[in-house]
């Protein structure tokens, strides 16, 4: 990338980096660390035309979420404004956008792909 004087780095984090989760302090810390790492590198490499961003998925239909208890899964979905779990394509489409020329002026950012869950998260705990 340095040799080519351009490039894109896209790191994958998690909604848990922003919200925390019971029993997942280590996971939340590691994902939050990726965000700080990415922002620091984005500042360092911006003038070298290397863009560094994060994608922060929420609950996406995967083998991992298939193992979630159905009652808990219904509760999670009720907290997502879009009313559904995301698909892998939702995340990959965001990554494709960040890898494309359409995102040349975007660096040091985290894009949330979670059906609005992060946006609405705090208000659910108040109600």
Where are these regions (language model features)?
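Short, flexible catalytic-loop segment of classical short-chain dehydrogenase/reductase
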Residues: 18, 35, 53-67
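Short C-terminal tail/terminal secondary-structure segment
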Residues: 19, 96, 107-127
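C-terminal helical subdomain
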Residues: 54, 77-102, 106, 115
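Active-site helix of classical SDR
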Residues: 30, 38
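Alpha-helical segment proximal to the catalytic Tyr-Lys
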Residues: 43-47, 104
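Residue(s) in the substrate-gating loop at a strand-loop-helix junction
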Residues: 14
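Active-site "substrate specificity/gating" loop of NAD(P)-dependent dehydrogenases
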Residues: 20-24, 46, 122
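A glycine/serine/threonine-rich, flexible loop-to-helix segment
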Residues: 47, 59-80, 120-127
């Amino acid at each position: 990338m340095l040799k080519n004087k351009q490039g894109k780095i896209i790191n994958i984090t998690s909604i848990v980096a922003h919200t925390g989760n019971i029993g997942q302090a280590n996971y939340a810390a590691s994902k939050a660390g990726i965000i700080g790492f990415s922002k620091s590198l984005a500042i360092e490499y911006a003038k070298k035309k290397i863009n560094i961003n994060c994608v922060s998925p929420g609950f996406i239909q995967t083998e991992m979420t298939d193992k979630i208890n159905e009652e808990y899964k219904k509760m999670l979905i009720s907290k997502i404004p879009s009313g559904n779990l995301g698909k892998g394509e939702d995340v990959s489409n965001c990554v494709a956008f960040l890898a494309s020329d359409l995102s040349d002026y975007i660096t040091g950012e985290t894009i949330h792909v979670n059906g609005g869950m992060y946006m609405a998260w705090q208000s659910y705990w108040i109600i």
